[in-house]
Every structure is written in C-alpha cells, then in structure tokens.
Amino acid sequence: MLSRCKKGVAFDLDREKITWVAKQRPEWMVYQADSLYCIKNNIDTGLKFNFIDIDPYGSSLEYVIEFLKSSIERDDHFIIVANDGLRDKLKIQAWEVKILKKAILKFGNNSIYKSYLGIVNWMINEFCIETNHELSRFGGYYCGKNNNMTHYIAEIKKGASAP
C-alpha cells in the first residue's frame, strides 16, 4: 500500500519514532506534533494529502472526524491508517467515551468491545456521509496484548454524494 502513496503526512509526539518515519518516508510531510491540534487548526503543508497515519495511543475516531470536517487540502481519493488504542478501555467503560455515544445507542454498550472493528467501520462511514465523502474500502485487525489494539485502513473519496 505505501508504495502507491507518493505523498502523505505522519504525526507523532515521540521524537525517536517520528525520526524513523521521516527516514522511511522522505517525500512525506512528517511532524513531531499533536495531530489533533494540527488537524483542528487546518494545518497547511502546501500539498494535498493522500495518506494519513494516525497513532493517538487512544481513540482515533476524533482525528478522523476532525480531518473529514477540516478544510485541509487532500486528494480526491485518500487513505487513513490508524493504530487505535481504545479497545482495552471499552471492556468496562465504553459508555464514558463521548465519540461512541451514537454507536452505543445503536448497538448497545455490551457490543462495543467485541465488535469494535465493525463499530469503527460503521462510524467512519457515518462521518463520511455527514461530511460529503464516501468510504470506499475499510479493513483492519486486532493486535497487541490481549488484542486490545486496533489497526485499520480506510480508503475515502472526497466529494461523493451521500447515499
């Protein structure tokens, strides 16, 4: 997948990690920064993004919705990948996660942990509809200790008509 992406952006607060990313992807825009802050403030990099790598050490969904709502320049077809660390908290405290409120009302609190990847897919699709985008492909898997991390990829088209 990365070989198809000629330009992109990566954010991370960890200096060592972001230095490694910059060496691996020299043609990308790479920031040691709080990505949510940058997205909310419509970071201007001078290029249209086509690949975004989100690694928030918690919920990634706030980042996705803020990016979709933003005026940040992007290609008509772009990719978001995320390393989402929220799943562990969902075992006992899903109801505390504000961004999951709509999903909890639809699917129930007890469904959130065991079906989290499907919930993320559904929520990103909802965000896309709300912001005039189309989710064209979604995939992911659980990993890490006790499968409490979630890695996913979302391919999104800009300006698609909501169904």
Question: What is each model feature region?
Answer:
Residues 1-163:
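SAM-dependent transferase fold signal centered on methyltransferase-like domains
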